[in-house]
Amino acid sequence: MFHRYIAQASNKPLLRLFSTRSRVLTLFDEKCRSCGIKLQQESPDKPGFFKLGTSIDRKKPKYISEANQKYNQFLSKLDVSDRDLLINNFNVPKNIATKPISLTISKQEENPTVIEKDEDIHSDTNPAELLESDYTCIRCRDIHHRSKFTMNAKEFVIDELDKVLSTIPNDSPLVYVFSALDFPMGINPEIFEHRDPKDLYFIMTKTDNLFPKSSGSHHDYCKTFLNDYLGKKYNVPPENIFIGSGKKRWRVKRLYEFIPNYSYFIGHTNCGKSTLIKSIKVAEELKKFPGTSHKKDFGKTDKLIDKSFANVGPGVSHLPGFTRDIMPVYINGNKTIYDVPGFTSNTYLRNIYEKLDSKTIAHLFRGSLAQKKATYKSQYITVKGPNVLSIEGIGFLEFPENTMYQIRNSTDLKLHVFRDITKVESLLYDVPKSLYPVFLLQDQTPELSQFNRYLVPPFYGIVDLVLENIGYINIKPVGAKKTNSLVKFYLHPSINTIIRQPIMNYINKTFTGQDEKGNPLPKRDWNRLSTFYLSRYTNEDPFYSKLIPTTKADVNEYEQVNSFVSNGREYNSEYALTSDNKFDFWKE
């Protein structure tokens, strides 16, 4: 049996695009519009299974009540003058004819204009684009509509960079997307072994977690910092660098012009590629409504924007590995870009997500506004050694005795302070229900012996402890220094981490510690009298450092530090860190 698909566009006749269901799938290359997997109907247990269900070729006719049907029948028999008496149009000028809405709808539904020949399809209409929102696999439907998923390697494939690049033509433009939440963890230096820096385009997304507006000094300072970092470290030209936000749809019109045609969007899993592509697509779709504001705001256009965001472009999800295959996205018939599955080098990435529901995963990745939570003006908590700072039970910072720190939280995770590491270890055997609100995994939290154990390299001044895809914790030592013992960090194996210089120093102006005449000021007067300056990246010192892997059997932490850097310097209990040598034991 033949099925008809009736589509109506503004000022265009209705089109019959397809005659059979198989023709639909052939034109769409048999791919899920949400994740890109090849669709199949044979095996429910294999990836890509889908059911047609209620689709565009099975749309139910609009329900019209019996009373309205009778009304329309009588109304259609009246002449225009009698019909005008039945409706409230006394304030309408006499020369403007008014047609009852109910009658108009019924006539259109009763006698649609149908073109029966395939060759009558407009040449500027891309069939794949029209079908973009029609067919999704069972996995994607369950995720989006039921919040139901099983995190495994079969349904959520996450490969390494080399394997992902092997699926992309060598001469195709690459757009590398990375997140502002965990910069620079999202940039894999191996990409420069495959492509020349001048042939790569870089986009920092999720910048709404760093500053609140898409324009202004913070945006400009951030762009300057990225130009310095990528330019001096990797020789990327500044015209190949862009910053924006897919979630807030910042600068998407400029982004549309920035990306080359037929480019492939690559990046770490969960970095925001699909959301960014979707935002570009939505911005172009909204051009069809010239009288409507395209800004996402708390106004009347929200429903239009949100509906467009739900119905066009690739699917988006907080789940890592959601996109499963390369997916073409057609934008306005003028540009084609490809959404590519994310990559990672962390083989344990899925472990934590197997134990979480979709709402909790969204909370894990949400982040918070650093401009509000992680500057010198922000609220902080004070932790004294040997206290342990819990990062909602997925990480534990153990501080040395006789030390004190101010902690500012730029994640969405809850912080909680415990007496010492012994107390934490005993709790993890059986987490009390009263502590469930501050333990992400609650009763499924592993014992401390199953966490990865690190030493934080020696640091001087403020540092950011960065958690991949999650955000960062700002750590500031305060008080007199009495020990060279190191901070220890216990972290769930599904998460990677680094420390870095405070990123806010590069997108905010900071204190010089001097007055307007250049005279040094005591710290108590900095807030009131100090001048400001903007830090610039020079590539002379490390911007970040890996943490030092360790085990419980390792006793001498000084030996571990020296073995980690192997630069001839010896860290010990007497070593004095200053502003001149503070990066001696950092390793990128």
From Swiss-Prot:
Which InterPro entries does its entry note?
G_CP_dom, Mito_lipid_metab_GTPase, P-loop_NTPase
Q: List where in the cell it is found.
A: Mitochondrion
Write out the function statement from the record: May be involved in the mitochondrial lipid metabolism.
Q: Which GO terms describe its cellular component?
A: mitochondrion
Top-level taxonomic group? Eukaryota
Keyword Membrane present in the record's keywords: the answer is no
Q: GO molecular function terms here?
A: GTP binding
| CP-type G domain mapped to chain residues | 158-346
Protein name, as recorded: Genetic interactor of prohibitins 3, mitochondrial
Q: List keywords of the entry alphabetically.
A: Mitochondrion, Transit peptide
Q: What is its main location?
A: mitochondrion
| Family under the similarity heading | Belongs to the TRAFAC class YlqF/YawG GTPase family. GEP3 subfamily.
The residues forming the transit peptide are 1-32
- TM ranges are none
